[in-house]
Amino acid sequence: MNYPHPIIAREGWPFIAIAAVIALLIHAVGGFGFAWPFWLLLVFVVQFFRDPQRPIPAQPNAVLCPADGRIVAVETAHDPYANREALKISVFMNVFNVHSQRSPVDGAITKVEYFPGAFLNAAIDKASTENERNAVVIQTASGKTVTSVQIAGLIARRILCYVRAGEPLSRGQRYGFIRFGSRVDVYLPLGSRAKVSIGEKVYASSTILAELEQ
C-alpha cells in the first residue's frame, strides 16, 4: 500500500500561496498582460511540488527507486555510511521531476546521519561526497543493508528528512523531500543485480532499481 499524502506536497504550500498572491495582485493592478509571467510561475511551482501516488511492484527482493529522475551512475563504490563496498546507483533529479523521496525497501532504520557540504551540480560524481547530504541506512528483515542518501544540488539547498533511527519503513513510504533539483544515491550489498542503466528515466516507487541477492 502506498503511503498516503496530498497530491501537492505540503512542502510546497507556502511557495504556492506566495506565487498565487503575487499573480493576483499584479493581475488586479496591471491586468493579464503584465501578470501572465507570474501566472506561469505559479503553474511551474505547482507542478514542481506535485507528489502523485505510484504503484508499488510486488516482488519481495526488489529495491525500488527512491526518487524520480535519470540514472547517472551504476557502479561498485565504497559506502561510507555503512563502511562497506557496495553497488551504487545514483538518480539525478532536475527541476521538472517530483522531488519527494520514498523508501526503496521494507526494513528498520539503523542510522540517519546529516552532513553539511557544498552545493555543486548534483549530476556530477563528486556531489556524492562533497555536497550537503543526509543518509538513511535501512536493514531489511533478511539482514541486508540498504543506504539511501539525499544530496543537495546547485539549486536545491534544503534537504528535509522525516524519519529517525529505530523507526520502521515500508517500501514506497515517503520519508523526505529535496527542493529544486538534487540527487539520491542508493548503496546495495554486492551481489545485488542492477535492473537499470545509465541515462534511463526512472520513477519513485514504481521503477525497480535492483534485486537483492536471495
From Swiss-Prot:
Q: Posttranslational modification, per the record? A: Is synthesized initially as an inactive proenzyme. Formation of the active enzyme involves a self-maturation process in which the active site pyruvoyl group is generated from an internal serine residue via an autocatalytic post-translational modification. Two non-identical subunits are generated from the proenzyme in this reaction, and the pyruvate is formed at the N-terminus of the alpha chain, which is derived from the carboxyl end of the proenzyme.
How does the cofactor bind to this protein, according to its record? Binds 1 pyruvoyl group covalently per subunit.
> Where does the secretion signal sit in this chain?
none
Which residues, renumbered to this chain, carry the PTM Pyruvic acid (Ser)? Answer: 182
- Output the InterPro entries linked to this UniProt entry: PS_Dcarbxylase (IPR003817), PSD-A (IPR033175)
Entry cofactors: pyruvate
Q: Which compartment or compartments is the protein found in?
A: Cell membrane
Residues of the active site are 182
Catalyses: a 1,2-diacyl-sn-glycero-3-phospho-L-serine + H(+) = a 1,2-diacyl-sn-glycero-3-phosphoethanolamine + CO2
Q: Name one GO biological process term.
A: phosphatidylethanolamine biosynthetic process
**Keywords, in A-Z order:** Cell membrane, Decarboxylase, Lipid biosynthesis, Lipid metabolism, Lyase, Membrane, Phospholipid biosynthesis, Phospholipid metabolism, Pyruvate, Zymogen
Protein known as: Phosphatidylserine decarboxylase proenzyme
Native species: Burkholderia multivorans (strain ATCC 17616 / 249)
- Lineage, top ranks: Bacteria, Pseudomonadati, Pseudomonadota, Betaproteobacteria, Burkholderiales
Q: Which gene encodes it?
A: psd
